[in-house]
Each structure stands twice: as C-alpha cells, then as structure tokens.
C-alpha cells in the first residue's frame, strides 16, 4: 500500500541552516518540542526583533502548526521563506515544504482519484485551495468540508453512488468531491481547466462563457474569464497541483 510521502519528522534544526540557531531562540525550540506552546510563543515573540528573523518565523510556523492554526502557520512560513510563492521552492527545507503542503488524507485521495480517473495531485491542490485540509471548515454560503461541497450537490451525488452524504467525514467528502469533479471533466469533454473553473464559478457560468468563445485557445479563454477570483483560482489550483507533484516524488 502507498504511504504518505509527506509524513513529517521533526528535524534537528542545526541541520536545516548553515548558521547555528541564535541562542535566544533555543529555549523556544525546546518548549515547542515539549508542546509548551504558550510559553514558546512568548519566548519567540519576545526575541523576534533581535533574533535571526527566518529562524524565529520558522519556529512560529512550527508552533502554530502544532497547535492547529493553519492560517498563522502559513503566514509565518511565508515570512521565513518568501520563495514559497515562487518556482524556487526547492530551496526550502523539506520539513517546511511538508508543513506548507499538508496531506492528511493521502490514502483516500489516492483511492478515489484512481476510481474516478483523476490526477491525485490535482485533487491535492484543489483540497489545499478549498480547505487547507480542514474537514470541518464551512463557507458563508454553506459549502462544507475538505472539498467544500454544497449540501444539495453532496446529497445528489450520494444518492446516485449510494454513499453517505456526511460531508464532514473526510473520506466521504473526498469520495463525493472527486465524483463531482469527474462529472465536471466529463461535462467539458475532458477539459480539466474548464472543470477547475466551474468548481469555483459554477458550471452554468463556464458553459455560457465557453459557448460565447468556443474556438478560443484554452490559455486565452482562461485569461478572458470575467470573474477575477475564478481566473486566479484556476492558476492557483494548477500551481498547487504542480507543487504537490514535485514534492511527493
């Protein structure tokens, strides 16, 4: 059975940078290792300005990750390693790449991607964008879970494939979400970029836009999408997919 290639092991921090850890951060490092998150955070914040900034932000990222705060973890990592937003991600220590690109339901993603004939790395990128692997996240309009499924959509797919519709269950959500994405791919004749766009903007909108420009090359069509959020969404999911493909091999 395939195992999660992003399983994380805490490194000896002396091995992830050329210079040694500043002495004012060593206590924070030890406190984080002991899961004393409150005191560790206070130590880091107290010494942040006078310490090595990337080290401090990286320690904060580990602290927030350990305490389940993915938003602050992401912000801290981006400060520590600005190259996370570029194509130079290979220069980021593997431990932090694994933190930035989590996969918490690897086996389910592989299983249901294969069942639906989908690229699992694309599904990893989509889940990252939709929920950052938080199975309980809910949008203001009611989209729920890892793949942010709307209740009517989830119920319709669940009825058709004889599945539970409990979208807060990670495996159920992935099963329903990958099935729904397969539907979108089929609807657009195998055009995955259009399926990604419709996952964000709705299939009705994308069908209407494509019918208005049926022969426009795909790259030009994607740039002409009238919703800025959807244009950026397609680019973001595509980039995340490529990142997951690269770091899991």
Give the positions of each predicted feature.
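Primarily a LysM-type cell-wall glycan-binding module
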Residues: 21
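Short Lys/Arg-enriched alpha/beta "domain-start" segment
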Residues: 16, 33-34
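Active-site-adjacent segment of 2-oxoglutarate/Fe(II) JmjC oxygenases
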Residues: 30
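Catalytic glycan-binding domains that act on GlcNAc-containing polysaccharides
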Residues: 1-18, 27, 39-249
């Amino acid at each position: 059975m395939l195992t999660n290639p992003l399983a994380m092991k805490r490194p000896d921090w002396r091995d992830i940078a050329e210079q040694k850890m500043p002495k004012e951060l060593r206590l924070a490092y030890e406190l984080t290792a002991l899961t004393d998150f409150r005191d560790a955070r206070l130590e880091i914040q107290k010494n942040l300005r006078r310490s090595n900034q990337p080290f401090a932000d990286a320690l904060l990222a580990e602290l927030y990750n350990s305490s389940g705060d993915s938003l602050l973890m992401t912000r801290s990592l981006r400060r520590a390693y600005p190259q996370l937003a570029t194509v130079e991600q290979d220069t980021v220590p593997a431990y932090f790449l694994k933190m930035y690109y989590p996969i918490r339901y690897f086996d389910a993603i592989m299983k249901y991607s294969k069942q639906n004939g989908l690229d699992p790395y694309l599904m990893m990128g989509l889940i990252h964008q939709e929920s950052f692997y938080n199975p309980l996240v809910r949008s203001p309009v009611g989209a729920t879970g890892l793949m942010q499924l709307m209740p009517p959509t989830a119920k319709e797919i669940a009825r058709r494939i004889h599945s539970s519709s409990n979208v807060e269950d990670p495996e159920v959500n992935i099963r329903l979400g990958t099935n729904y994405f397969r539907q979108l791919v089929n609807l657009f004749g195998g055009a995955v970029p259009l399926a990604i766009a419709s996952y964000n903007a709705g299939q009705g909108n994308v069908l209407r836009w494509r019918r208005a420009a049926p022969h426009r090359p795909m790259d030009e069509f994607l740039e002409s999408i009238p919703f800025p959020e959807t244009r950026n969404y397609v680019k973001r999911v595509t980039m995340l997919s490529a990142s997951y493909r690269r770091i899991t091999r």
